[in-house]
Every structure is written in C-alpha cells, then in structure tokens.
Design a protein with these regions (language model features):
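A C-terminal cap/extension of S-adenosyl-L-methionine-dependent methyltransferases
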Residues: 199-254
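Conserved class I S-adenosyl-L-methionine
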Residues: 1-52, 152-177
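A short glycine-rich, Lys/Arg-flanked "PGG" loop and its adjoining helix->strand segment in the class I
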Residues: 136-150
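Class I SAM-dependent methyltransferase SAM/SAH-binding core
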Residues: 58-112
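Short alpha-helix
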Residues: 178-198
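A short His-aromatic
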Residues: 127-131
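A conserved beta-strand element that flanks and buttresses the S-adenosyl-L-methionine
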Residues: 124
Length: 254
C-alpha cells in the first residue's frame, strides 16, 4: 500500500467500500435519466472490448468484468481484477462460478500496481478513476499498459454546477475523497493517451427524473426526446458537452 497522506486516503476509501455506501435510492432516482445512454454505452463497450480478446487485461475494480467481459463473450488470455476493498472483491467473485472467464482477483492499491511495466494490452474500469489520486493512477495505468494498448473508463463529470449541488446534498452515496472529473483531469488524460470521449446525460437528467414520476418504463417518449436532444446538443454545441453527467473514455497509449 502507498505511504503518507495518500495511504490515509486509500484507507478511507477501503473502509467506505467495506462498510458499503447507501446508493440504492440515489440510483433509483436517476434510473430514467441514464437508461438510454447506458444502452449506448453497452454498445460502445462491446465494440471496444473486442480488442481485449485473447489479450492480457486489467480491470481497476472487481465488479464490471461480468457485464463488460463475460456478457460480451470476451475471453482474455488473462484477466486481473484489483480492488482495495475485500467486500468489493467478494461481490465480484459471486458470478465467477458460473463464468467461462476466470478472473484473478487481487486485493491491491491502484496507486501502486504490483505488475511489471508493459504488462497489459487493455486496462478498463467503471466509476473508479474519480476515487483515486488521478495523476498517480494515470501514471500507473500508463506504466503497466503496453505501447499502443487500450483504455476504457466510464466516469462522472463534476463541471455542471447543478451536479455539484446534487453531490453536496447526497454525501451518503459517495466517499469523502472521490472527485468527479473536471477540465484538468480531461486535459491530463490527453498527455498520455489518444482519446475519444462519449458524453452522457444533460437534459436527460431533469427530463428523466420527471419521466420517472409519470412512467414506469424508463424507455418512454420523454426519455427518448431527452436522449436525442442531448445527442444533438453534443454535436452542435461542443462546449455544452462538459456539462453532461458522465463521460465514457476510449483511449490508446501514446
């Protein structure tokens, strides 16, 4: 484990995830806002993870391998799933006995990856980078990734002022140290990787919450309208994309 102030942060994150976060109600609130974008994300993830077939792959985290790797029919040569929380590793292992993919689960600090340089062809994670010391984590990802290797990360953005307010009002759904990505983090990523960004949820947030009041099905005319408006706004007014709720990052190591 890392030493000094960073080790204290790692310990807080470990304790928070071992104890469990209160996210069920929070996630239900945003079920309608994210539904169609999660479908789009799944298609992009499926396409990008073809590059992980029969390759050495690392997940920062221990949960997403089931939906991203196993359910997409990807069979890596080796798949390592690392997490600082034993409880999260235990959750990840629950699907292992039914899986054709057999991940290696390791209790490990993502700030100090216990792998040799250039070990992996593909590194991915879902909602993990914003829990880490971002610069340190990127350095480690870059180090263990082979030249030309791929990355794939889904992360929250923290630029929208309303999103900042929501985060302040829901401390029970997050850890003390987590920090959604800002301009600085997006720019830092470009120094090490050639990237494409897929932005998710802008008008889909308020209209999705409203649709949840009137519709049980998250795929309804209001969420479809919001989804298409968001795609149009992202295309026509690029400066607005930074106000979206999430971003899916696809990249190649420089």
């Amino acid at each position: 484990m890392t030493e000094g102030p960073l080790s204290a942060r790692v310990q807080r994150e470990q304790d928070a995830f071992n104890d469990g976060l209160q996210r069920d109600g929070y996630m239900r609130l945003f079920e309608h806002t994210s539904h169609l974008f999660l479908q789009r994300r799944a298609r992009i993830v499926q396409n990008e993870l073809k590059h992980a077939q029969d390759k050495n792959v690392l997940e920062l985290g221990s949960i997403s391998w089931k939906s991203w790797i196993e359910d997409n029919g990807i069979k890596p040569r080796n798949l390592y799933c690392i997490n600082i929380s034993q409880e999260e590793i235990n959750l990840g292992k629950e699907s292992e006995h039914l899986s054709k993919v057999k991940p290696h689960f390791i209790l490990m600090d993502a700030h100090n990856l216990d792998f040799e340089d250039d070990s992996f062809d593909f590194v991915y994670g879902c909602a993990i980078l914003h829990h880490l010391d971002y610069s340190r984590a990127l350095d480690e990802i870059y180090r263990v990734l082979k030249p030309g290797g791929k990355i794939l990360f889904a992360e929250p953005l923290g630029i929208n002022p309303i999103a900042k307010l929501v985060r302040v009002m829901t401390p029970f759904a997050r850890t003390i140290d987590e920090k959604p990505l800002m301009f600085k983090e997006l720019l830092e990523l470009e120094k090490k990787f050639n990237t494409s960004h897929y932005y998710e949820e802008f008008l889909s947030v308020p209209l999705g919450v409203i649709s949840g009041i009137f519709f049980n099905n998250p795929n309804n005319w209001l969420t479809r309208l919001a989804f298409n408006l968001d795609l149009s706004l992202n295309r026509m007014f690029p400066f607005l994309r930074y106000l979206f709720r999430h971003v899916l990052i696809v990249g190649t190591r420089k």
